Amino acid sequence: MMTRLVPNIFYNSLSEGLDLFVTCLGFKVLHQDATLAVIERDGAKAYIVESAEFAAKDRPQITIETDSIDELYREIQSRAPHMLHPNSNRIEKKPWGAREFGVLDKTDVCVVFRQF
């Protein structure tokens, strides 16, 4: 039945979202038009939507679970170290048992990577 939850992530400019998800995180663009990009990597998918109205209302935190956090961290650290979250810029073991780190873009969209 249900196979995947796919979020819409709103930005003032489509290029801001593509900078985080494509340039920093290595997602591929499956479709792009003037106000929408469908992105995907390793089965994780999202819609990047240009909408100043909704971007002003919502700056989400998104969590992506991974089975290879060390490899992913090294990749992002070499690709875009400036985007590592200032409060979560290295892999840390959390009290709930997960290992995590995060990235933060200039619009305050946060992506947390988690491995149990």
Question: Where are the regions that the model predicts?
Answer:
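Short glycine-enriched loop/turn motifs at secondary-structure junctions
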Residues: 1-3, 54-58, 95
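N-terminal beta-strand motif that seeds the catalytic metal site of vicinal oxygen chelate
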Residues: 1-18, 62
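Conserved short beta-strand elements that form part of the metal-binding/catalytic scaffold
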Residues: 29-60, 110-115
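Conserved acetyl-CoA-binding loop of GNAT-fold acetyltransferases
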Residues: 24-29, 80-82
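Conserved active-site alpha-helix within GNAT-family acetyltransferase domains
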Residues: 15-24, 101
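Vicinal oxygen chelate
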Residues: 14, 62-110
